[in-house]
């Protein structure tokens, strides 16, 4: 990492173990990395490799078993409950399934407004200012103003995920864990959401931890990519370098799994 880049996140020997009927599950096992402000670290691996648990442990949605998370100079792992509430203004998450992570009884405006009310940014009586803020967020994530009173079941997957992104952006955070935010969407919608997230990152100077099982998703989005397998980091490199020269056989297997349109071959077969 260049000396001119400011480190916003440092993860040191982070571990998260779960006790199961068959013994101890090492979901996250001694993970180390640093992330510069405004950059994206892609975390890639198959289902069950520990990548989502890593993201949630960094945010202390899971309590770490051991290790440290330093965010913007603060030791997240040592913060009190009250300190964590304040810190959550700067550390947010976008979940994989917008239908499961959004309250079906809340409208678009209520969902985006909820974190603002919880953090005391507005009082319920400040309706005009709160509504103005919500509408600004809706504009930022590409949600039409006519949807302000719509419910999740009335919207398609792409719009529901825009609500989830809007909710994460409402408090204007510095860092967002993006937990497979496009895996539940159609390919055409995936591209729209990825472009939106890139635009928002540039506009707001955001830092992303982007979790996915698909290397092709993070190829152009990430500055660095970390490959996880069975809770461990088996390879980490600059994005371009990892695609050109993978060091680990598992990384090569993930690259081989990316579909390639071989038009010449198809024409030859005809």
What is each PLM-predicted segment?
Residues 2-7, 21-24, 238-270:
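Short catalytic/signature loops enriched in Gly
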Residues 59:
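Helix-to-loop junction immediately C-terminal to a conserved catalytic motif
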Residues 67-75, 87:
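Conserved ABC transporter NBD signature motif
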Residues 75, 117, 128-146, 255-256:
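Conserved ABC ATPase "signature" region
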Residues 151-155, 159:
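Conserved ABC ATPase signature
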Residues 170-174:
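A short, proline-enriched helix->beta-strand linker immediately N-terminal to the Walker B motif
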């Amino acid at each position: 990492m260049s000396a001119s880049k400011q480190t916003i996140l440092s993860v040191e020997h982070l571990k998260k173990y779960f006790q199961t009927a068959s013994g101890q599950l090492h979901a996250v096992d001694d993970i180390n990395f640093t992330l510069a402000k405004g950059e994206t670290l892609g975390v890639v691996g198959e289902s069950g490799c520990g990548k989502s648990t890593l993201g949630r442990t960094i945010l202390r949605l899971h309590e770490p078993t051991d290790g440290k998370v330093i965010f913007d100079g603060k030791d997240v792992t040592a913060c009190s409950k009250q300190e964590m509430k304040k810190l959550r203004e700067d550390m947010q998450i976008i979940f994989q399934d917008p239908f499961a992570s959004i309250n079906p009884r809340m409208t678009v405006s209520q969902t985006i407004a909820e974190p603002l009310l919880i953090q005391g940014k507005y009082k319920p009586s400040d309706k005009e200012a709160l509504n103005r803020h919500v509408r600004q967020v809706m504009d930022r994530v590409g949600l039409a103003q006519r949807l302000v009173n719509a419910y999740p079941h009335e919207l398609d997957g792409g719009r529901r995920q825009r609500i989830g992104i809007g909710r994460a952006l409402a408090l204007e955070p510095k860092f967002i864990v993006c937990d497979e935010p496009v895996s539940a969407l159609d390919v055409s919608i995936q591209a729209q959401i990825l472009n939106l997230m890139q635009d928002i990152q540039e506009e707001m100077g955001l830092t992303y931890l982007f979790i996915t099982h698909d290397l092709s998703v993070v190829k152009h989005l990430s500055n660095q990519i970390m490959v996880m397998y069975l809770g461990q980091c088996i390879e980490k490199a600059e994005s371009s370098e990892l695609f050109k020269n993978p060091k680990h056989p598992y990384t090569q297997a993930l690259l081989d799994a990316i579909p390639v349109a071989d038009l010449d071959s198809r024409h030859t077969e005809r």
